[in-house]
């Protein structure tokens, strides 16, 4: 058996030497046929791991001026999350998600993956090669038609980490300066983890529940209706500062809110700026 063929087959499939040698022997040295056989072996090995829990992993970002993607690929241990093959796989998936403008997990799973077939097949092959269950769990896609998309991944190594954020800024101002503003906001989002962009975007049921809890707490103070209302409104304002992005104190300067920072940024970009949307991915979070 030609050793060069065995090495080539291993490089192309990522599987072990013994599997590659056996496949070539069974396929009379035909590399193309052996690849098909090894892919079947890889999928079979992956199926055996389907019930295992993949709770570690990484967040990957792929960013361009007007479009950004965040994906979460899970594995079972931090050891595999730091493996070069895992890093290469998730980086490729983020790139494919961006190139194909994937707005859902299913669309990305069915996208083509060069030399393998589909993204889903590449993930299952990765499960076989790395020996742990791999799972593509979440994807965030954000596009800005009249402005920029900026982003930040915490622990950023080649756009990879455990938490990532994208923000959309609507403006006709200087694009490079908008990117700087957007990255600062994305860093804030990663640190403070807001639940909604504005008060209008906050889940109404959650907001009503919070107000009901506060009203119940204030009842025991035996204050007049007018004073009670002021106390409730004040505590709701504090609540908004905790969960609403535009109401939060800016992490780099707590003397102003994010909404104030947005207004100040308009002078540097020479145009009005609107923070129109954001996305946040935290590894392992269900949100």
Curated annotation (Swiss-Prot):
The keyword Hydrolase does not apply. PROSITE patterns: EF_TS_1, EF_TS_2. It is found in: Cytoplasm. GO terms for molecular function: translation elongation factor activity. GO terms for cellular component: cytoplasm. Residues 77-80 are annotated as: Involved in Mg(2+) ion dislocation from EF-Tu. Coiled coil: none annotated. The keyword Protein biosynthesis applies. Associates with the EF-Tu.GDP complex and induces the exchange of GDP to GTP. It remains bound to the aminoacyl-tRNA.EF-Tu.GTP complex up to the GTP hydrolysis stage on the ribosome. HAMAP family: EF_Ts. This is Elongation factor Ts. It comes from Wolbachia sp. subsp. Brugia malayi (strain TRS).
């Amino acid at each position: 058996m030609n050793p060069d063929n065995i090495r080539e087959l291993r490089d192309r499939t990522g599987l072990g030497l013994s599997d590659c040698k056996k496949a070539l022997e069974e396929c009379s040295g035909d590399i193309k046929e052996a690849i098909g056989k090894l892919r079947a072996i890889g999928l079979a090995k992956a199926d055996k791991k389907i019930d295992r829990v993949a709770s570690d992993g990484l967040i990957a970002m792929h960013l361009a001026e007007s479009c950004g993607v965040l994906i979460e690929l899970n594995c079972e241990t931090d050891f595999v999350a730091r493996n070069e093959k895992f890093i290469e796989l998730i980086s490729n998936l983020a790139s494919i998600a961006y190139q194909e403008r994937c707005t859902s997990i299913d669309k990305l799973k069915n996208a083509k993956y060069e030399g393998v077939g589909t993204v889903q097949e590449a993930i299952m092959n990765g499960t076989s090669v790395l020996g742990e269950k791999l799972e593509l769990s979440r994807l965030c896609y954000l596009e800005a038609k009249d402005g920029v998309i900026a982003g930040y991944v915490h622990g950023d190594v080649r756009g990879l980490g455990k938490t990532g954020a994208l923000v959309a800024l609507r403006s006709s101002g200087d694009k490079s300066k908008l990117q700087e503003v957007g990255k600062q906001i994305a860093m804030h989002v990663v640190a403070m983890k807001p639940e909604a962009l504005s008060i209008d975007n906050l889940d109404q049921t959650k907001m009503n529940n919070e107000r009901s809890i506060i009203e119940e707490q204030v009842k025991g103070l035996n204050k007049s209706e007018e004073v009670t209302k002021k106390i409730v409104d004040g505590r709701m304002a504090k609540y908004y500062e905790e969960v609403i992005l535009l109401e939060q104190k800016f992490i780099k300067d707590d003397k102003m809110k994010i909404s104030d920072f947005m207004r100040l940024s308009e002078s540097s970009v020479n145009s009005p700026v609107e923070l129109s949307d954001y996305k946040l991915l935290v590894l392992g979070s269900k949100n």
